[in-house]
């Protein structure tokens, strides 16, 4: 998903780039992120622009991920590059087994695990959740969202106001 891109993604992509002359990144859709995480933090075009502007990324491809896999994207890559190139589907520290990976069935693709490191060093979800769960600091004090009723457009906030201060 690369939503948002973090140090673990960078390590994965740099290590994957060392395996080949070209790095093609398959970028999941906003719909996939909504199914997996509730909603995207950054939309597809924002994520694509970030990735396309990394010196080690040669191409960013969209694909049909409605089956929650990258099979369609890998099939696109095979059509673009086979038979002249060795093709790798690289997985970082959070995927390390053929048992739970539908992409293993794509002909012409070699699977690589632990690329960029054998352990997961960061998480997009963790970064986003930590950012939004911190109290917002202001000159007058701070506030925190205790409950978000997004469907109603309502947030319940706690305000802590410093003595002698008032909100703006």
Spans of model-derived segments:
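Nucleotidyltransferase catalytic core that binds NTPs
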Residues: 1-137
């Amino acid at each position: 998903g690369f939503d948002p891109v973090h140090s673990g993604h960078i390590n994965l992509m740099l290590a994957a780039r060392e395996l080949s002359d070209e790095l093609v990144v398959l970028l999941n859709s906003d719909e996939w992120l909504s199914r997996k995480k509730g909603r995207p933090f950054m939309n597809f075009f924002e994520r694509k622009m970030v990735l396309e502007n990394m010196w080690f990324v040669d191409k960013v491809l969209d694909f049909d991920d409605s089956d929650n896999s990258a099979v369609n994207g890998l099939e696109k890559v095979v059509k673009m590059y086979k038979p002249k190139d060795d093709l790798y589907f690289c997985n970082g520290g959070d995927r390390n087994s053929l048992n739970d990976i539908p992409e293993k069935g794509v002909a012409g693709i070699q699977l690589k695990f632990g690329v960029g490191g054998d352990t997961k060093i960061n998480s997009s979800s963790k970064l986003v959740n930590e950012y939004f769960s911190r109290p917002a600091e202001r000159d007058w004090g701070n506030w925190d969202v205790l409950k978000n009723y997004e469907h109603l457009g309502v947030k319940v906030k706690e305000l802590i106001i410093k003595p002698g201060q008032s909100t703006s």
